[in-house]
């Protein structure tokens, strides 16, 4: 029985090692900005535009088979802005995507992605308390969103890459702002683990 257990463990480890051989993991940090249509006035109410400002972003992906994989990302406004000129707020965007990363040449890889996520608009100055989570100094307005994007990885040194990127966020029921469509564009610096 002991020999059978050892044989099964050795076989399982060899399967895991061979399947992990073809995988690639990438992580990146970048900065960008967002744009959207200009603010509007409806029924005497002003709806500002969800645009401008610096948006740091963290992203990570794993390529599993034939350059297809999964990607996750979070980006947020680096500093608070004023909503309607008086209320401090900060939008946070997060998404989970299917990713296709075809290799274009030795040093260039394209990225095409699509997925789902959300926008969390945090309005500051309001204290909210909960028995389970404690107290926070903001109130959140959350919205479901679709995410479509593209990027171009340019490997500049070994597995280090720079990536210009663009994202289209289609935000459901984005009542606080003038548009349901937001475009984020920027650049990232990243590293590929497990080859490229």
What are these model-derived regions, one by one?
Residues 42-47, 81-87, 132-138, 172-177:
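Extracellular loop and loop/strand-boundary signature of outer-membrane beta-barrel proteins
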Residues 31, 129, 133-135, 146:
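Gram-negative and organellar
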């Amino acid at each position: 029985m002991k020999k059978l257990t050892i044989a099964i463990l050795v076989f399982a480890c060899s399967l895991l090692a061979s399947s992990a051989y073809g995988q690639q993991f990438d992580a990146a940090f970048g900065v960008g900005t967002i744009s959207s249509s200009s603010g509007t006035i409806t029924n005497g109410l002003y709806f500002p535009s969800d645009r401008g400002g610096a948006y740091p972003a963290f992203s990570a992906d794993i390529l599993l088979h034939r350059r297809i994989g999964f990607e996750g990302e979070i980006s947020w406004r680096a500093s608070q802005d004023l909503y309607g000129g008086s209320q401090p707020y900060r939008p946070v965007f997060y998404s989970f995507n299917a990713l296709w990363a075809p290799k274009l040449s030795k040093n260039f890889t394209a990225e095409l992605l699509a997925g789902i996520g959300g926008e969390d608009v945090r309005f500051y100055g309001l204290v909210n308390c909960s028995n389970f989570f404690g107290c926070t100094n903001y109130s959140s307005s959350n919205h479901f969103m679709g995410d479509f994007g593209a990027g171009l990885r340019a490997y500049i040194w070994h597995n280090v890459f720079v990536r210009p990127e663009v994202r289209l966020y289609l935000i459901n029921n984005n009542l606080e702002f003038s548009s349901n469509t937001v475009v984020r564009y920027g650049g990232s610096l990243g590293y590929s683990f497990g080859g490229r």
